[in-house]
Every structure is written in structure tokens, then in C-alpha cells.
């Protein structure tokens, strides 16, 4: 597994005789997003931007409390829509996970009904989703998928440790065209420190 995307704290293992391939090329994300990933040191080594699309730097929005979190997340969604990204291609990703997320417990964000995993499965093993127009998911569950526009929200940490780096890396690399990041004041300070 790509070490920068290892979200779960599990012991690694070796497969005897297996060939290991290391590739730091990123074909999905706009070059501007990859530049920020490299500036923050989110991956071991430099990530090579291979997308032909330069794009824009991610927008960063800070919040002080739960009300501010909702307001800034909604503003980030609106920003992506104003840039012409179809609503069906926007996803809100919580960096906190299903158990700790404030937003994943909500039925709506502003006027938008949220489409989210309800934590159960059909008899056939398919996930059960709520009805809604705006997809919201955790970074953990959205790993391996992508969307044109991503709002990475509930980014809350005091130190940019390995866990925070990995969640940021996975969340940021889900974006194909544009990225908005909603951070707590503590995370804002930690990110500013990493760039200093």
C-alpha cells in the first residue's frame, strides 16, 4: 500500500517474492493541488504532477466553532458550484470519520439534503444511502474514488503528525478539478507552521 495513503494503523507485512513498485506520479489532481501537497510535505518524497491541468490553488477556510464549520463548508460548496462544477460532481469529505463527524450526523447542509451512508447494508451487501442531493462521506470511506470538486472539511488537528498528513493527502488527492479545505483554527496554525 502507498504509505502516504495508509489511513488505518495496521502492521504491514511482507509477501515473500513479491515485486515492490514505487511511483510518486499523480495523474488525477491538478498541478496546483500537487504543489500544495509537496509544500506541506504530505508524502515521502516529491509527488510528480502528471495531470495536464494546472488548476487553482486550494481554497482554505477556517472555522472557530460548529456553526462556523457549517457556514464555511457551505461557502466552500457554493464556491465550487460558482466555478461551474456540476452539483452531482461535488463531494464533501469529512476528515473526522463517521463516529466523530458533526456534519455526517446532519440531514442537511444549508438548503441541501445530504446523501450519506447510513451505516447498514442490504441483504445483498450493498450500502444503504439516505436520499439527498449533496454527497457527504468520510475520507476513509471515499478512498479510491474521486470527484471533480472536493470540499475537505472538519480538518482539525494541533500538530501535522503522520495521521493528519495521511488524511490530508488522501482527501486532497480525491479532487480532479478543484479543492476547498475547511480547517479549524488549530489546524490552520499547524499548516501555517509547516509552510514557514
Task: Show the residue positions of the predicted features.
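Conserved helicase motor core of SF1/SF2 NTP-dependent helicases
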Residues: 1-196
Amino acid at each position: 500500500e502507498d504509505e502516504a495513503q495508509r489511513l488505518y494503523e495496521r502492521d504491514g507485512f511482507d509477501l515473500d517474492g513479491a515485486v515492490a513498485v514505487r511511483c510518486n506520479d499523480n495523474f488525477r489532481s491538478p498541478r496546483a493541488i500537487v504543489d500544495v501537497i509537496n509544500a506541506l510535505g504530505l508524502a515521502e518524497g516529491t509527488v510528480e504532477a502528471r495531470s495536464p491541468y494546472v488548476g487553482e490553488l486550494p481554497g482554505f477556510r477556517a472555522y472557530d466553532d460548529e456553526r462556523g464549520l457549517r457556514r464555511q463548508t457551505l461557502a466552500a460548496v457554493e464556491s465550487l458550484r460558482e466555478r461551474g462544477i456540476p452539483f452531482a460532481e461535488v463531494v464533501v469529505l469529512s476528515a473526522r470519520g463517521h463516529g466523530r463527524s458533526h456534519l455526517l450526523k446532519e440531514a442537511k447542509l444549508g438548503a441541501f439534503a445530504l446523501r450519506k451512508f447510513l451505516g447498514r447494508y442490504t441483504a445483498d451487501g450493498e450500502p444503504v444511502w439516505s436520499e439527498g442531493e449533496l454527497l457527504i462521506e468520510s475520507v476513509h470511506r471515499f478512498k479510491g474514488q474521486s470527484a471533480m470538486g472536493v470540499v475537505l472539511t472538519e480538518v482539525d488537528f494541533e500538530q501535522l503528525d503522520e495521521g493528519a498528513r495521511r488524511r490530508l493527502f488522501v482527501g486532497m488527492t480525491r479532487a480532479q478539478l478543484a479543492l476547498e479545505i475547511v480547517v479549524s483554527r488549530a489546524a490552520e496554525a499547524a499548516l501555517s507552521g509547516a509552510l514557514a
